[in-house]
Amino acid sequence: MNTKFKYIFSAAALLLSVGLTSCTGDLDVTPIDPNLNTKDNTSPESSLNKCYAHIAMAGNGGANGDSDVDGIDGGTSGYVRQLFNSQELTTDEAICAWGDEGISNMNFNTYDASHPMLKGFYYRLYVGITYCNQYLADFGDYNATMSAEVRFIRALNYYYLLDGWGNVPFTTAISSDKPARIQRADLYKWLIDELKNEVEPKLNDASPKTSTTTGYGRVDKAAAWMLLARLYMNAEVYTGTADWANAKLYAKKVIDSPYKLYTTKKGQWSAYQQLFMGDNGENGASVEAVFPILQDGLKTTSYGTTLYLMAGSNDNSEHIKSATVAGNNTTGGWAGNRMRPDLVLKFFPNNDAPNVAAYAMPAAADDDRALFDGEGRNVSNGDDEKSVKVFTNGFSVCKFNNFKTDGTAGHNALFPDADFFLMRAAEAYLMYAEADARQNNGTTTAQGTAYINALRTRANATTQTAYSLRQICDEWSREFYFEGLRRTTLIRFGYFGGNVNYNWNWKGGVKSGRNFDSHLNLFPIPTSDMVANSNLIQNTGY
C-alpha cells in the first residue's frame, strides 16, 4: 500500500459507510447492517483505513457530521477528547470551566452509569472494535501485516476498556448474539496472548517515519511492545499480580528500537515543544512517535483531537511564540481546560510560580516542559464551584499549538496540522525506570536513573543520582501532563480511589481534596448497555 496514510483518512471514511447501532441503543443487535455487504462494497485498504480513522475523526463527515457514535455530539465523542476527559479531568492535572453535562462530574469525581461522556467513549471504543471485527471477517486472509495492524487497533481499544471499565462485553466476531462478559484478568490474558502471538510477529519492523514517508501513521512492532509494556506495568491493578520484569523487558525493546527521544532544538522551539507543534510530523520529532494519530487542517479534521487539546485549553490570549503574537495559531479559543494548582506545583514546588507568559515559563521553571501561561491568571481554581467555571482561575496549558518551526502557515485557520502522538518513546523510558524502582525497594538503579535523566536532560532540567517512586510519579506528570495517562498512573501508584490520602484541589468536590471510595477506580458500565445485555454485571459501587 503506497498511498501516504495521512491524506486518505477522509476518502477512506467516505468509501466505507457502515450502519451501526446508536450509542443509546445496544450491543445486543448486529452492529453491522446485515443488508450491507461490506466485502463487496469496499476494498481491504479502505476498510483498514476506517479502522485507523475512528481514532482520528468523529466519523465519515470529518469534523462536521455523520459521527460514528450517535447520542452525543460528534466532536465531543472524539477518541482523544474523551481519553483526555476520562484520564485528565478526573485527576490532579486538569479541571474544566464548562457547564456541559458531565463535566463537573469528572472535575469532582461524581460520575455514574448515566454519564454521557463516559458512555460516548465506551461506545466509540466498541465502534472501533466493530470496524476491526468486520475487517477481519471480510479481509482477514488478504494480507498478514494489515490484519496484524487491525488486531493491534482492536487490542488497543480493548486495553482502554480493560483499564477504564474492567469487566466488559467481549467479542471478536460480527454476530447478533449478546456479547459475553469477560473478567478483567481474562481480558488481560487475552490481550497479552493476542499481542504476542497474532500481532507483534506479523507487524513490520520498528521504523520511525515522517509524514512524507510511506506508512506514516501505521503501527509497527514498537507499538505492540509499547502496549505490552503498558499491560505489564499495570498487571497488579488488572490481575492482582505484578509483572515488573516483563514491563522492563518490553519497555527496553522500545528504548533499543530505532524510535528515540527527539532532542534537537530549532530556533526558539525546544525539542520537547516540537513534539506537539503543527509540523511535528515533519520537523523530526516523529522519531519519537511510536503511534501518531494523524491530523491535517484540510484533509483530516476533528473537534476531538489536537484542536481540542489546543482550543479547549486556551482562550487565545496566551503568548506562546512571543510577546507580540497571541494564541495557538488556530482561531480556536474555547477557554475550558486548565491546570489544577497541583500540576503547577510539580514545576514550582515552592509555590512561587510567576504570572508570566507561556514563552517565558520554561526558563522560569528551569524545565522546557513547563508549557503553560500564567499571565493574568490565578494558580488557584477558585474557592467555590462557581469560580471553578472561570477560565482564568487556573494557569492555561500551551503544550499543543499549531505553529511550525519553519514559520509557515497552517493548512487551515481553525483545524490544526499537529498530529497527536498517542504513544511516544519517552513513555518507555519512564516505564522502565518505574518498574526498575519497584524491583529495587522503591529506588531506581543506575539504569533506571539514566533513563529519567535522559528525559530531564532533554528538558534542560536538573538531574539526580536516583529517584524514589514518589518522584517518579511526579515525573510522569511533568513529562506527560494532558496526554491521557494520568488516571491510570495514579491508580497504579495507589493514589486515586480509596483511603489513599493523596489529595488534590477539588478532588471529590472539596476544594482541599478528599478521599473517595475505591469503586471509582473503575468506571460504570453505561446503563443503556446494562439494560440491553443481560450478560453484564455492573461494577461494584454503581
Question: Residues of each region from the PLM?
Answer:
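Glycine-rich, aromatic-lined ligand/substrate-binding cores of catalytic
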Residues: 57, 287-388
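Conserved, well-structured interaction surfaces
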Residues: 45-49, 53-59, 93-165, 177-189, ...
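Bacterial Sec-dependent N-terminal signal peptides
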Residues: 2, 7, 17-43, 155, ...
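Short coil/turn linking the two alpha-helices of tandem helical-hairpin repeats
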Residues: 162-164, 169, 207, 234-240, ...
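Long, intrinsically disordered, low-complexity segments
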Residues: 23-24, 38-44, 95, 125, ...
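Membrane-proximal, proline-rich intrinsically disordered regions
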Residues: 23-78, 534-542
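Flexible, polar/acidic helix-loop-strand segments at domain edges
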Residues: 100-120, 339-424
